[in-house]
Design a protein with these regions (language model features):
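Soluble extracytoplasmic domains of inner/organellar membrane proteins
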Residues: 43-100, 107
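Charged, low-complexity, helix-prone segments enriched in Lys/Glu/Asp/Gln
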Residues: 37, 69-72, 76, 127-138
Length: 156
């Protein structure tokens, strides 16, 4: 019917806007798993620009990308990455606790810090909690309460 045709015409621009919103969200979010997240957005964009892909498959892939981003808010993970500290790249262990905290610890565990919204900032006194969080995230220690620094926006 005519309504089906109208809806089919509206889906591609909606999917493009949703992909744009997702890309903007990732660019403004904490810088975790950026390669993986950017690759996912690029795959969605490739799907949206491929005329052979059905509208239903486009919708499925966009919604799947949104669901993966949503899950980041509910999970704890650790991985190795290279970040810039004091003007030089250093390989560190990253600890992400949902979207609440993104922390790093030097490989020798001599320093730990947090992403403060714009840069990595060393935080004294949190080496052991960050180490414990990394162990929990890597499943080498049982989950437990963890005291970690949290960046609060708009607060004092």
């Amino acid at each position: 019917t005519r309504q089906v045709v109208v809806i089919q015409r509206q889906i591609p621009p909606l999917m493009e806007r949703m992909a744009d919103s997702l890309e903007q969200f990732v660019s403004l979010d904490a810088p975790f798993s950026l390669d993986e997240r950017t690759k996912r957005i690029n795959q969605v964009r490739a799907t949206l620009s491929d005329p052979k892909v059905t509208a239903s498959e486009q919708v499925r892939q966009v919604l799947e990308a949104y669901n993966i981003e949503r899950e980041y808010g509910r999970t704890i993970e650790t991985y190795e990455d290279s970040i810039e500290l004091d003007g030089e790249g250093k390989v560190v262990n990253i600890l992400r606790i949902g979207r609440l905290a993104l922390m790093y610890q030097l490989k020798d565990q001599s320093e730990a810090g947090i992403w403060n919204g714009s840069d990595w900032q060393e935080v004294d006194g949190f080496r052991i909690p960050v180490r414990d969080g990394i162990r929990m995230a890597s499943k080498t220690a049982p989950l437990d309460l963890l005291a970690v620094p949290v960046q609060v926006k708009g607060g004092e």
